[in-house]
Swiss-Prot record:
Active-site feature positions: 19
Entry GO CC: cytoplasm
Enzyme Commission designation: 3.1.1.29
Natural source organism: Mesorhizobium japonicum (strain LMG 29417 / CECT 9101 / MAFF 303099) (Mesorhizobium loti (strain MAFF 303099))
Gene: pth
Name listed for the protein in its UniProt record: Peptidyl-tRNA hydrolase
Broad enzyme group: hydrolase
Residues annotated as transmembrane: none
Keyword annotations: Cytoplasm, Hydrolase, RNA-binding, tRNA-binding
């Protein structure tokens, strides 16, 4: 049995935040592998399923990010699992958008969710760091991670989440380099496809059928002789 934990903050107002990309990864895995419905347990939401023949417990702590360790620690103690059975998915500002890295152990890197988990159970577990980019200045970090992904971000975020879900079996089997390669190829492939799209020709603005009919008609020719011609000359004068 393995535990996959996706980190984030509970509630609709945080759902699309960069800080919640761990929740998004957990949701993508649950959908892709037809996990059980989410249920409340261990101060979080859990779903159960099987990947590559291994039973997986997905957990999304509902304690808010800074207390994630309470939920994750409770789950590991309940199932009597070692730290090596845990994989945590979370946002990483020190990675460019769309980049993904895996490592086991190490420091929290300023991430409060990871700091909480380290404090409760230790740090010898696998981390899947999902790059969300850095705002450039330290004072803007909180605003950045608690801000929503922009519409343009879906160009790399959606293929990355799909790749995480599609290739989760590689994590189960311990093929970390293969998993990172698949994720990178998915994001690069999407970017290349966008660049190779033929430029769309600008369509002429639609005109009403009346204007179209008018534009197709030859300009009316004014009469040069007769009563009508005489009347027009009185109205507008003789242009000769």
């Amino acid at each position: 049995m393995l535990v996959f934990a996706g980190l984030g903050n509970p509630g609709a107002k945080y759902a699309d935040n960069r800080h919640n990309v761990g929740f998004m990864a957990a949701d993508a895995i649950a959908r892709r592998h037809s996990f059980s419905p989410w249920s409340k347990k261990f101060q979080g939401l859990i779903a159960e399923g099987t990947i590559a023949g291994e039973k997986i417990i997905l957990i999304k702590p509902q304690t808010f990010m800074n207390l994630s360790g309470q939920s994750v620690g409770e789950a590991l103690r309940f199932y009597k699992l070692e730290l090596s059975a845990l994989t945590v998915f979370y946002d990483e500002i020190d990675l460019a958008e769309g980049k993904l890295r895996i490592k086991t152990g190490g420091g929290a890197g300023g991430h409060n969710g990871i700091r909480s988990i380290d404090g409760h159970i230790g740090n010898a577990y696998r981390r899947v760091r999902i790059g969300v980019g850095h705002p450039g200045i330290k004072e803007m970090v909180q605003h950045h991670v608690l801000g929503d992904f922009a519409k343009a971000d879906r160009e790399w975020l959606d293929p990355l989440l799909d790749a995480i879900a599609d290739n989760a079996a590689m994590i189960v089997k311990g093929d970390e380099s293969g998993f990172m390669n698949k994720a990178a190829l998915a994001v690069q492939g999407k970017a290349i496809a966008e660049l190779e799209k033929p430029a769309q020709k600008q369509q002429p603005k639609q005109q009403s059928h009346i204007r179209q009919a008018r534009s197709q008609q030859a300009p009316a020719k004014l009469p040069e002789t007769g009563p009508m011609a005489a009347m027009l000359k009185k109205l507008f004068g003789n242009k000769d």
